[in-house]
Amino acid sequence: MATSNLLKNKGSLQFEDKWDFMHPIVLKLLRQESVTKQQWFDLFSDVHAVCLWDDKGSSKIHQALKEDILEFIKQAQARVLSHQDDTALLKAYIVEWRKFFTQCDILPKPFCQLEVTLLGKQSSNKKSNMEDSIVRKLMLDTWNESIFSNIKNRLQDSAMKLVHAERLGEAFDSQLVIGVRESYVNLCSNPEDKLQIYRDNFEKAYLDSTERFYRTQAPSYLQQNGVQNYMKYADAKLKEEEKRALRYLETRRECNSVEALMECCVNALVTSFKETILAECQGMIKRNETEKLHLMFSLMDKVPNGIEPMLKDLEEHIISAGLADMVAAAETITTDSEKYVEQLLTLFNRFSKLVKEAFQDDPRFLTARDKAYKAVVNDATIFKLELPLKQKGVGLKTQPESKCPELLANYCDMLLRKTPLSKKLTSEEIEAKLKEVLLVLKYVQNKDVFMRYHKAHLTRRLILDISADSEIEENMVEWLREVGMPADYVNKLARMFQDIKVSEDLNQAFKEMHKNNKLALPADSVNIKILNAGAWSRSSEKVFVSLPTELEDLIPEVEEFYKKNHSGRKLHWHHLMSNGIITFKNEVGQYDLEVTTFQLAVLFAWNQRPREKISFENLKLATELPDAELRRTLWSLVAFPKLKRQVLLYDPQVNSPKDFTEGTLFSVNQDFSLIKNAKVQKRGKINLIGRLQLTTERMREEENEGIVQLRILRTQEAIIQIMKMRKKISNAQLQTELVEILKNMFLPQKKMIKEQMEWLIEHRYIRRDEADINTFIYMA
């Protein structure tokens, strides 16, 4: 009923009836004078009533407000412009602006009804709606048109002068600059981009003045103080400008003023002097000036492509310094694998420390270190390994390689074998040193060479039972697996340990079976090792030797025992890998000699004639050993380095085993003895096996050739694997993928890749694309 009456009387209440009551309250609010609660609420209801009853009430209110606001702003303008001095003007403006801007949030509230009637918006008290209020917009637009647009350049220039003064060390009220910034940010009427006026004016002026300042200051400072002091200056100024920017520039999320300012500063302070600063890098790296390098790194990391020259300098230094140190120590490290590995680790730790302290282990610098260190590890300057390859009876040489993998394997052997080195270390220390070897191994390109030598040493340790710690031996296999060694290689090593354990059980059964039987040799004195040919991969070459009767008679007994337990398997005897202990008795004393089967066969030639002299020719007939093996074996008995009195004597004297003739005479040294601390020992034990290889010269040649042949097969397999998957591929992409597949075994040489590609084309596995000879197509 009440609503219908109001509507019936619509038009009877006019704007003019209420404005006289509203007007004084509006003026009080503009002047920041206090109003009563009743006046505040009356203003809300009067605005609502006028908008509801007077058809043109909303427009009239809007116009009246505009006039009042304009009048108020004119008064403020007069107060501001009464100051001629720019700084005084700025201060006056900030005072007036702060008061006015506060009222921009208060005055629009009672006039929310205007939003509904003029714009058709639903009434809301949300802050976001208040910011879009037409009254607020009216206030800000009027301020902008009446005051700000007329004096903004003076205000802006004054603000920039204050910032300039601050850069020179003068103090001032920072709120003056902040106030100007706030004006720019809040006076934009563009709803699509509310920061447009700020960006086009204040931000641009701030960036331009900053750049001008440092374009003048920076070159002067550099010239007077030098590069190293300038870097400190630039770093300090960048930090200083960032703090200043956070104070004076807009920091809301959608605004990137601070980032733009920092880019401007970097251009003026760093990019402009990039070449001059980087010229110092190489010298700093050489002098290990980590603090200065860290400073340079932090500066150059802000510059596009600023880091690349530093990475190049680091790589060049690691390679040149690393190789220089290796060459300087060449005399020692080429003959001592322990010293060699220690030298490599010293270099790695030195360069790693440099990267950590100077570049905070930044991944880019770690990659540069790895690349350069790999070059040092795989360099063939100091010592090289040449792997021969025979094709159709012709001996060919492959490209020389670093001997590093061989020396790493030798060092592992020193740690894993019973040696003076391993005896003075605890298990934990041995483990730590092996882990260090694995670290270096990661950088070795041709890991297949390491595998070959490591396996040869392991074979020797397992056969001679000279491992320092069996648990560490088996752990080493798993560590090799963890560092990415090929699974087939690691599995073979694991199988070798399995064979040794199985052999222990077989020995126990053999001894149990024959404990009451009379054999040529007591069962307790025999240790048989049954080894899987696939895992141990011995050469096909068999070396014949005439064994002593006791051993010859034992062999059938072992074969019969084995066949009872494992039918269908065939045993091949490898005397080359066998060894034993014999007792040497003379008037001086009694000594146990650890010998190879070949040494044993030679010494047994004197068993029935201990004082006779036997010629080289007759020893060859007695032992039936090949010439090369007999010479090598005899030399180990006449010139064993650890003995002062040798087991055998010979005449005439020669410089090497190659100089033995058919007529060279050999005899047992009846005065043989072991001497310790210059005293003759009546009893003792000596290992005469020493570093004698458990392979022949020809076997070693075959193994070296085998490495190359296996590389050829692996390369062919990898190419086919890639071609099957890709079907069609460019030569460059093929080489990249090929290296990725083979990198855990070896780095294929370009020559080898080319040869295998030609072989596969010839045998119609792949073909060249007719349209592009550098593209290959798989032929199913």
From Swiss-Prot:
Membership in a protein family: Belongs to the cullin family.
Pathway(s): Protein modification; protein ubiquitination
Subunit-structure text: Component of multiple cullin-5-RING E3 ubiquitin-protein ligase complexes (ECS complexes, also named CRL5 complexes) formed of CUL5, Elongin BC (ELOB and ELOC), RNF7/RBX2 and a variable SOCS box domain-containing protein as substrate-specific recognition component. CUL5-containing ECS complexes specifically contain RNF7/RBX2, and not RBX1, as catalytic subunit. Component of the ECS(ASB2) complex with the substrate recognition component ASB2. Component of the ECS(ASB6) complex with the substrate recognition component ASB6.
Protein's name according to its UniProt entry: Cullin-5
Annotated Gene Ontology cellular component terms: Cul5-RING ubiquitin ligase complex; cytosol; nucleus; site of DNA damage
Keywords: Isopeptide bond, Nucleus, Phosphoprotein, Ubl conjugation, Ubl conjugation pathway
Organism: Mus musculus (Mouse)
Cellular compartments annotated: Nucleus
InterPro entries: Cullin, Cullin_CS, Cullin_homology, Cullin_homology_sf, Cullin_N, Cullin_neddylation_domain, Cullin_repeat-like_dom_sf, WH-like_DNA-bd_sf
Protein purpose: Core component of multiple cullin-5-RING E3 ubiquitin-protein ligase complexes (ECS complexes, also named CRL5 complexes), which mediate the ubiquitination and subsequent proteasomal degradation of target proteins. Acts a scaffold protein that contributes to catalysis through positioning of the substrate and the ubiquitin-conjugating enzyme. The functional specificity of the E3 ubiquitin-protein ligase complex depends on the variable SOCS box-containing substrate recognition component.
GO MF annotations, alphabetized: ubiquitin ligase complex scaffold activity; ubiquitin protein ligase binding
SUPFAM superfamilies (UniProt xref): Cullin homology domain (SSF75632), Cullin repeat-like (SSF74788), Winged helix' DNA-binding domain (SSF46785)
Residue numbers bearing the Phosphothreonine modification: 210
Residues joined by cross-link Glycyl lysine isopeptide (Lys-Gly) (interchain with G-Cter in NEDD8): 724
Positions bearing Phosphoserine: 34
GO biological-process terms attached to the record: cerebral cortex radially oriented cell migration; proteasome-mediated ubiquitin-dependent protein catabolic process; protein ubiquitination; radial glia guided migration of Purkinje cell; reelin-mediated signaling pathway; regulation of neuron migration
